[in-house]
Structures are given as structure tokens and as C-alpha cells.
Design a protein with these regions (language model features):
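Alpha/beta-hydrolase active-site loop
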Residues: 244, 250-342
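Domain-level recognition of soluble alpha/beta enzyme cores
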Residues: 63-210
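Gly/Ala-rich beta-loop-alpha elbow adjacent to hydrolase catalytic centers
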Residues: 215, 348-357
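Short substrate-entry loop that stabilizes the transition state in hydrolases
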Residues: 187-207, 212-250, 402-404
Length: 527
């Protein structure tokens, strides 16, 4: 064996005979270990490339789609009263369609203000722990358990087109962008009330009733939390959907049999329109004041029809209403027989809806209305009817009272104060208050869905839930007054603090007014 080749014995015994040739193991210092981990972290760290960001956004949107959650909106919270809340959509045909104003659409010369059906959402108290079982009457018959209404009514693309028209950019690109915004913003938001749940058991006694009218660019779903909170405390609230062109979009849906008899489609979409879309029968243009008068007349007719529905419900016609409704809900309507306290019926509205509610009070069919709740009565919706002859509660948002708006030659705040003063003189029961830190949309669901956006856009300082708590509390106090004649210990029992906005009536009143109320309320007029 050549002498320069390693021998097996050398290899096997090298560790003993040649210790210097063995590698030396050196301890790793903590600093070196940290450095190695840092290098590994840099290698593992994703690079924020456009493709990486888009991939993660796509995964997030896909997860939202699969889970049916809206990526840009917060879920509506549950109700806090002692009762759970049920809801039913009812759309009922008139015995004979009514044309409330002669204006026609430019597009097809069809009547712009033709009232065929009335659509309303009922919110009512139900027992805790119940789950809905919805049986749809129209084919195919199917049962849906634990069903909730969507906050954005279907089809979504109609609502998107309505918002595009509000923005004045009704073209295919704008519609697509609005559709995407609506889907991402609220497409899967649901109202946390159980559809078709049974009414609270009869031992609860007669239930007070509120009929509510939504504002411009709103719909019957946009006040679901305010009305649901009332329902969770024993009130039956009916939110009316207005088809006067002031809503982004709505669908007039007649029962299939009625539509077949009339040889027409069972669904007629109504997308937002304004005076530029209308003509008088003689071909002349419709002015903005004329449009508002026609819209309010149409709203009055819808509110009066809603009152008639509630009277029929109380009279025991629930089964007939269920059968006539094109929405397929209302299996428990017969249980409403004799359950409504129509002697304590309150007509309410927000913004444009508040103006309409005041106007509807003048109609003989509204003679049995016991009181009115007026939230931010409209500034651009025409004159306010000031001959109110029922107890009246006017609640302004902070933004509504603070802005010095000209209203037919005088400050809007002064006009509203005189409205309340007239009601006080005629009925000895009227209040005018401002909730501090709130904005015009504070009574709607929008601040709950988009808290940061609404604070930035609308300027509200009071939290969304606290604001709604105040609206609900003062409304319940007023309903209690209508029912019992007693003001209670809430805001209706407080003396005047500010006859004009943000100006104390006296230093003595400022010192006597509780601090916890002073940060929230100004009382401008009281019984």
C-alpha cells in the first residue's frame, strides 16, 4: 500500500492520535444569534409589492363573500330592551290605484305619482329566544329558519343606480362604481330582528304604535335600530317606504294574481327622480317647489294607507293581510288582533319625513293620531305646517340647531320654535329640544355602520350608540306621556334651559341643570 494513502487505522484513530486536526466547536454569542434571526426575518418578510397587496385584498373580499359579511361596515348591534324584536315586511295593494298628482315621466309619459301599494316594515316585541320560520306563499314554497332582512333591499343594483342619480352621474361607469361601493359598504348587512317571529304574549297588554316616515335619500330600513330599540321596549313601529322618488330605489311589488289580472309585471322599480325627469300634462316643466309639494302629497297618501293597515290589523284582519301581501311574510299577523293601543298612536318622521308627518296630521283620516315626534324637520322640503293640534315632540340634532339656515325669510330654528309654541298653545303639550354632539344622520343606522366615516363626514361628536340611546329615551318618554298623561322624570320633565340655541336663559338655570344632562341636552320649550 502506498505510503501516502491514509490507512484505515489512521482514519479510525485520528481523533486520538491527531487532536489538532479536529474542528473546534465555538459557542455562539447571543449577539450572533440575534443577527441570524434578523436575517431569517428579513428573508421571511413579505415584500409589499402591488401583486402581494392585491392578492391579500382579494382573499379578504373572498372571505367576506363566503361569510356574507360586508368588508367596510360594522354589523348592526342587537337591541338592548327587555324584549326580542320581530319584523315583518308587508306590501298591500290599494282597492283602486290612486294618482295623487298629474305630473308624468319624460321617459314614457306614465304617471309619476301613482299609488298602487303601500309597503311597510313592522317592528314589534317578541319573546326572547324565539327563532323565525318563514313560509313563503309564492312558489316555490319553502321554509327559511332564522331569517333576517338585508339592510340594503334587493336588488342591490337598483339602489346603486339611485345613488348614482343622486350624485348626478347616471351612466354605466358610475352605476358600476356605485354598485361596487354599495356591495362592499353594506351588501351583506342584515337587520338583527327575527322575521315573522310571534308577537309578545297577550299578557303584555295593549302596545303603543309609532308610524315612521323616512327622510330624503333614505328608505324604510335606514332607521332600523331606532325603531327596533322602541320595539324591544314594547312599541309596535311601522316604517313606511316612500315611492315618491326621494328614496334611492324601491320596487312596487304586486301579488302575482293581481298583476296577471292587470296584464302587467308584478314588479315595478321606482328609482330616484327629480323635477328634471318630470313634465306637467301640458308639456311644461315641473319646478322644484312643485316637485316637493307633489312628493309630500304622495307621502301623505302612503302614511294614511299605513294607518289604515294598522287599523285593519288591530280589527282582526291579519289573515287577510297576510294573504294579500306580495312579500310572503306575516304568518303571525292574526295575533295582532286587539293588541294595538291605537289611542296612543304616534306619527313620526325624520327630515323630509318630519315635514310630511306634520302635513299628514291635517288630513281627516289622521284624526285619531294622538301625538307627533318630529326629528330635524326639513330645511329644504317646503314650509312646515304649523297648525298642529296634537301633543308634539320636536328633537333637533346639534347640527340642525347650530346652523343658521334661512327658512322662507327667517331663521329655521325660529320657525321650528314657533311651530312648537303654536302646538303648546293649542294642546298644552309640546317640547322642543336639541341633542348636543349629534349630526343630522345620528338617528339613522349610518353612524353605527360607519362610525369613523360618519364622525369625519357629518361632524358628530357624540358616539353613535349614545346618541341613539338619547333619541330612543326621549321618544319613549313622549310615548309614555301620550299613553298616561304623565311627563315622568326624564327630559320632558326638565325646565327650559335655552330659549335660543346655546344661550342660557339664566345663570341660575345653568347652575341648577345637572351636569350629565348639560353635556347632552338643551331644552328650548316644554309643557
Amino acid at each position: 500500500m502506498p505510503s501516502d494513502c491514509p490507512r484505515p487505522s489512521d482514519a479510525s484513530s485520528g481523533s486520538d492520535s491527531h487532536p489538532a486536526s479536529r474542528p473546534v466547536s465555538r459557542p455562539v454569542s447571543p449577539v450572533s444569534r440575534v443577527a441570524r434571526l434578523a436575517r431569517l426575518a428579513r428573508l421571511a418578510r413579505p415584500r409589499l409589492t402591488p401583486s402581494y397587496v392585491l392578492a391579500h385584498v382579494a382573499l379578504y373580499l373572498l372571505a367576506c363573500l363566503l361569510l356574507q359579511t360586508s368588508p367596510l361596515a360594522t354589523a348592526l348591534p342587537g337591541y338592548t330592551g327587555p324584549h326580542a324584536v320581530g319584523t315583518v315586511d308587508l306590501e298591500l295593494p290599494l282597492a283602486r290605484p290612486v294618482v295623487t298628482s298629474p305630473a308624468v315621466r319624460k321617459l314614457d309619459a306614465s304617471p309619476a305619482f301613482r299609488l298602487e301599494t303601500v309597503l311597510l316594515s313592522l317592528y314589534y316585541p317578541t319573546a326572547q329566544g324565539l327563532r323565525s320560520v318563514v313560509v313563503l306563499l309564492s312558489p316555490p314554497r319553502r321554509r327559511r329558519h332564522h331569517h333576517h332582512h338585508y339592510w340594503v333591499p334587493r336588488p342591490v343594483h337598483l339602489t346603486a343606480r339611485g345613488f348614482a342619480r343622486f350624485a348626478g352621474v347616471d351612466n354605466p361607469v358610475a352605476r358600476c362604481l356605485c354598485w361596487l361601493a354599495v356591495w362592499l359598504g353594506a351588501g351583506f348587512v342584515t337587520i338583527p330582528a327575527e322575521v315573522d317571529a310571534p308577537l309578545l304574549p297577550e299578557h303584555a297588554g295593549p302596545l303603543p304604535v309609532v308610524v315612521f316616515s323616512h327622510g330624503m335619500a333614505g328608505s324604510r330600513t335606514h332607521y332600523s335600530h331606532y325603531l327596533g330599540e322602541l320595539a324591544s321596549r314594547g312599541v309596535v313601529a311601522a316604517a313606511v317606504e316612500h315611492r315618491d322618488g326621494s328614496s334611492p330605489a324601491t320596487v312596487v311589488q304586486r301579488a302575482a294574481a293581481a298583476a296577471a289580472a292587470a296584464s302587467s309585471s308584478s314588479a315595478r322599480p321606482v328609482v330616484h327622480f327629480d323635477q328634471s325627469d318630470l313634465l306637467h300634462p301640458d308639456g311644461s316643466a315641473v319646478s322644484l317647489p312643485q316637485l316637493k309639494a307633489q312628493q309630500l302629497a304622495f307621502r301623505d297618501a302612503e302614511l294614511l294607507q299605513a294607518l289604515a293597515v294598522l287599523r285593519a290589523l288591530h280589527a282582526g284582519n291579519g289573515s287577510a293581510l297576510h294573504a294579500a301581501s306580495s312579500r310572503g311574510e306575516g304568518a303571525h299577523l292574526p295575533s295582532f288582533r286587539g293588541r294595538l293601543d291605537l289611542a296612543a298612536l304616534v306619527l313620526a318622521g325624520h327630515s323630509y319625513g318630519a315635514t310630511g308627518a306634520l302635513q299628514a296630521l291635517a288630513h281627516p283620516s289622521a284624526a285619531h293620531v294622538a301625538g307627533a315626534i318630529v326629528l330635524d324637520p326639513g330645511k329644504q322640503s317646503g314650509p312646515l305646517r304649523d297648525q298642529v293640534r296634537v301633543p308634539l315632540l320636536v328633537v333637533h340634532s346639534d347640527a340642525w340647531s347650530r346652523a343658521a339656515t334661512d327658512f322662507f325669510g327667517r331663521p329655521h330654528f325660529d320657525a321650528v320654535r314657533d311651530l312648537a309654541a303654536g302646538a303648546l298653545a293649542r294642546t298644552n303639550a309640546a317640547w322642543f329640544l336639541t341633542i348636543l354632539g349629534t349630526s343630522h344622520p345620528s338617528v339613522t343606522d349610518a353612524p353605527l355602520l360607519y362610525p369613523l366615516l360618519m364622525r369625519w363626514a357629518a361632524g358628530a361628536k357624540l358616539g353613535a350608540r349614545e346618541a341613539l340611546t338619547q333619541y330612543v329615551g326621549v321618544s319613549l318618554d313622549f310615548i309614555h306621556f301620550i299613553k298616561t298623561g304623565r311627563r315622568g322624570d326624564g327630559m320632558l320633565g326638565q325646565n327650559v334651559t335655552h330659549e335660543t340655541y346655546d344661550k342660557w336663559v339664566s345663570k341660575e338655570r345653568q347652575q341648577s341643570y345637572p351636569e350629565d344632562l348639560a353635556r347632552l341636552w338643551q331644552v328650548h320649550m316644554r309643557m
